[in-house]
A protein has these predicted regions:
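Glycine-rich loops and low-complexity Gly/Arg-rich segments
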Residues: 47-52, 62-67, 82-83, 102-103, ...
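A short SAM/SAH-binding and catalytic strip from SAM-dependent methyltransferases
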Residues: 74-86
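Active-site flanking residues adjacent to catalytic metal/cofactor-binding acidic residues
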Residues: 24, 41, 79, 104, ...
Length: 140
């Protein structure tokens, strides 16, 4: 999958116009999920909340293969998830396996430093990320 810098609202607009897509919000919580998605997954058990809203939900486990078929989803969304994943490269491989394309939203060290006043890992963050615009690569 190619990596490009984009904006959350651009992606939400695209998804709202393409309702036929099978969209997974991976790492969502019930209080903060993308309304454009039609399948949801997280390590916490939100099944009851999502099922009451007639939304498809799958509980996943850390450091385990994701319980989805190869290329099952047209689009996979990760909003502030990658920085928490202990096995980053294996997790990336799983994302490529289950999704045809997607959107990954990441915090930056600068943002976390300004907002939280520290450049130490916080809120369970295991990684810092930086996008190299010239070479179109994500550094960690």
């Amino acid at each position: 999958m190619p990596i490009i810098r984009t904006h959350k609202l651009t992606q939400k607009n695209y998804l709202s116009k393409n309702k036929h897509l099978k969209i997974l919000d991976l790492g969502c919580s019930y209080s903060n999920y993308w309304k454009e998605a039609n399948h949801f997954a997280d390590i916490d058990d939100h099944y009851e909340n999502f099922s009451k809203s007639n939304l498809k939900y799958t509980k996943i486990e850390i450091n385990k293969k994701l319980p989805f078929k190869d290329k099952e989803f047209d689009y996979v969304i990760l909003s502030h998830v990658m920085e928490h994943v202990p096995n980053l490269l294996e997790f990336k491989d799983e994302l490529v396996r289950i999704g045809k394309s997607g959107y990954i939203e990441l915090p930056t060290k600068l943002y976390d430093n300004v907002v939280f006043g520290s450049d130490e890992p916080i809120l369970g963050h295991k990684w810092w990320f930086e996008f190299d615009d010239d070479n179109k690569i994500l550094k960690y």
